[in-house]
């Protein structure tokens, strides 16, 4: 199984440092048109590095940090499947006397937030020991599985918000850039340089292009990682059903 999953108190500063490093190194190494697209450097409307693109980079890296935590969680949950918490042969039948040692082991392997499989096994064993009913145990397991799936979905709320926020910032940056360029052209007292105005307007659209690319990356990674976590939930339910619920003997 994977190690401890970093919390937001660790992820946020690490994500900010990574974003600042990306901006700093990119500013030094990437120049010309690519530098204008990615960083709006040199900027005509903002004191560098306080540009819309750089703000989007910071938000983007925060989203990547959240996804990293979810990816680590998915790896950890998948790792529980191979721990052989339950007998996996075709002959073993479990009675109430057999469940004590199993529960002692799984109780140490889960917490409130992590450990879908040991949590399901622990809860199912407790229900069976208290009710002596396989049907009630199966019903409790199904209810717990639905709650876990809902909890997994809720964990992606911030990532979904960031995937929405990034293109929103891009659109705002583009509108601001277009407005500022047109305002400067309108307030010009000399001859209007059409070429310079067109170049400035083009830079305004770069903000949206970068934002849409970042949003697409976040959504793509979110789909892959959420699928990994949801697969772990389904595998935990299937494992518990096959190797615990279907082996329970009420006699």
Region roles according to the model:
Residues 158-184, 205-221:
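Bilayer-spanning, highly hydrophobic alpha-helical transmembrane segments
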Residues 57, 61-70, 171-175, 214, ...:
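Alpha-helical transmembrane segments
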Residues 49-59, 160-166, 202:
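Alpha-helical transmembrane segments of integral membrane proteins
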Residues 35-45, 182-202:
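Membrane-interfacial helix-loop-helix connectors in multipass membrane proteins
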Residues 2-145, 250-251:
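Large intracellular
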Residues 1-13, 132-165, 192-199, 226-233:
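Membrane-interface, cytosolic juxtamembrane amphipathic helix immediately N-terminal to a transmembrane helix
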Residues 138, 157, 189-251:
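Channel- or pocket-lining gating/hinge segments that regulate access to a cavity or pore
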Residues 67-81, 181-188, 223-230:
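Perimembrane helix-loop junctions in membrane proteins
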């Amino acid at each position: 199984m994977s190690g401890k999953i970093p919390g937001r108190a660790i992820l946020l500063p690490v994500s900010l440092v990574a974003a600042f490093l990306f901006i700093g190194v990119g500013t030094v190494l990437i120049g010309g048109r690519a530098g204008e697209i990615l960083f709006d450097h040199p900027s005509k409307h903002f004191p560098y590095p306080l540009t819309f693109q750089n703000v989007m980079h910071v938000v983007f890296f925060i989203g990547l940090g959240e996804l990293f935590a979810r990816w680590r969680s998915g790896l950890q949950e998948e790792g529980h499947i191979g721990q052989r918490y339950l007998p996996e042969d075709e002959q073993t039948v479990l009675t109430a006397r057999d469940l004590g040692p199993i529960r002692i082991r799984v109780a140490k392997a889960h917490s409130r937030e992590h450990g879908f499989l040991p949590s399901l096994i622990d809860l199912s064993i407790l229900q069976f020991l208290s009710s002596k009913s396989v049907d009630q145990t199966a019903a409790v397991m199904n209810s717990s599985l639905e709650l876990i799936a809902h909890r997994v979905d809720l964990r992606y709320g911030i990532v979904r918000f960031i995937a929405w926020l990034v293109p929103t910032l891009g659109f705002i940056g583009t509108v601001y850039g277009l407005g500022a360029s047109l305002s400067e052209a309108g307030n010009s007292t000399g001859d209007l340089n059409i070429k310079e105005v067109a170049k400035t307007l083009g830079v305004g659209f770069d903000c949206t292009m970068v934002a849409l690319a970042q949003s697409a990356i976040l959504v793509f990674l979110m789909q892959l990682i959420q699928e990994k976590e949801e697969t772990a939930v389904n595998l935990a339910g299937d494992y518990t059903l096959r190797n615990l619920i279907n082996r329970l003997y009420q006699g």
